[in-house]
């Protein structure tokens, strides 16, 4: 078992790759009142087009299949659902699908070994029948229809549709109604057999645990299972243009107060994908659009917005920044956001203050087993090297104001997409 020292924080994460290929990460905290376990598959909604080792065929599956499989995987061969198993243990379980991966997780206070056994058993013991697929299809179709009436959901995906040409993040994680109708049991089996393999998965166990004993038990459970040869699926690479799809669109939705989004698409070569750059960019955005920013407080005091937020995402060859607001004055607020983007700034005092706050948040993160689990997942999925960022505290400590100013000068505003959602006309 390898020990990963989280430098400067006096924390340790234990790691081992099992013979099956499963990566296991464990973090102990005897002060925690509970444990959190996640079993994660490196398969998300964007991975619909792929090739298999030794197979010349290019596979292209319907959008939404990762989410469909996540739902379907809760069914048990003897009838019932995985929820029934965990209810007996008093354990909360759930799952989610993102663009990049699928996670099956649980939280509890007792019977850790039984919980681990049940989790590994139900995820690695698939039971797919045409009847179950069709039953689940009906449930997912209803979920998708509800999403069509959810303004936040519609607005979220519309931003990506207007920004991305080829990147599959411009498609709904759940898929369209037609996608859901077209997913077959053969599609489900193809994805499960090739992506739900220990070589393409990792497990994270955090909280009130004994790392050594937990690892031994996970090994024992995994050694009792048989897996086919891993075919190393290769997801098709795309070349995403730097331009946005639409520079402006106005739509209607079930909102009382209009929503606006100003979305900036920046080529990654302008801001190379490094942990340091991600932190610096977040610091700059917090300073200009965050909760304590002068710009946000000014808009709220003048009652121009009821809310203002920002987000940033790395997608294929580009960095996407969204500035979102709820406002009765959409055109005016879009104009003000554009003006602010053209005059981004950060003072040395504010930079140092936000740097200290971020370091404090990093320390407090290790008080919560679920937060630590989520943080490890994020590092494995989203970091450039797909591994735990063990020197994160050092990176924060060594950030300089001069680096922030340099990165600020590289933020390119050539490609902007504006989206406005106004209330439906009565």
Regions found by a protein language model. Name each.
Residues 121-130, 221-229, 339-348:
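A common structural junction motif
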Residues 27, 34-48, 81-122, 156-178, ...:
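M16 family metallopeptidases and their MPP-like homologs
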Residues 1-81, 192-298, 416-426:
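His/Glu-rich zincin catalytic helix
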Residues 126-135, 150:
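Short secondary-structure capping/junction motifs at helix and strand boundaries
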Residues 145-150, 244-256, 360-376, 380:
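Short, low-order "capping/linker" segments at domain edges
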